[in-house]
């Protein structure tokens, strides 16, 4: 059975490293949000104009209906607006953030820095074992190995990084403990969306 104390340490390492990736991403996200705001505002304005026309027409008809029917229309309108917000988030914000993240993680030097940071983090926690580092499938292993250098490569099983099944980012596997420290692109995108989604909504959908 795995040592629960060590597993807690592993979780702390992953959390700390993921949070460190947020700072440059927040700066880029600000630019994405600014660029997206004009596009999102246009989409929302058009949708709200159409919604206003529909609501006006529906209101005239609703005057002849029971309050229960009017309430149902209001609820439907709220659900439609929420669906619109989610569509804008996915189209304007998430896709832009994913594209930026993919481009950033395609840099072999970035992958090398992430691998080195993960190795240093587990060493600082006193965790040892056979290590296998995986990088994104579109990143050149040779370039990453050159950035890592002989000292770090000597700590890896096979004396070099391996290609993972993910697009970008890295994973570090502690073989004898069957642990995987995950900083892959999908994991980082989910993390960034959770941290930045609220700020995006507040900026884009103010007053809506």
Swiss-Prot record:
MF term (GO), any: proton-transporting ATPase activity, rotational mechanism
Ion transport is among the record's keywords: yes
Annotated GO biological process: proton motive force-driven plasma membrane ATP synthesis
Cross-referenced InterPro entries: ATP_synth_B-like_membr_sf, ATPase_V1_Esu, T3SS_HrpE/ATPase_suE
Domain of life: Bacteria
GO cellular component: proton-transporting two-sector ATPase complex, catalytic domain
Keywords recorded for this protein, A-Z: ATP synthesis, Hydrogen ion transport, Ion transport, Transport
Pfam families named in the record: HrpE (PF06188)
Record's keyword annotation contains Endoplasmic reticulum: no
UniProt record similarity statement: Belongs to the V-ATPase E subunit family.
Function according to Swiss-Prot or TrEMBL: Produces ATP from ADP in the presence of a proton gradient across the membrane.
Name by which UniProt lists this protein: V-type ATP synthase subunit E
Organism phylogeny: Bacteria, Pseudomonadati, Chlamydiota, Chlamydiia, Chlamydiales
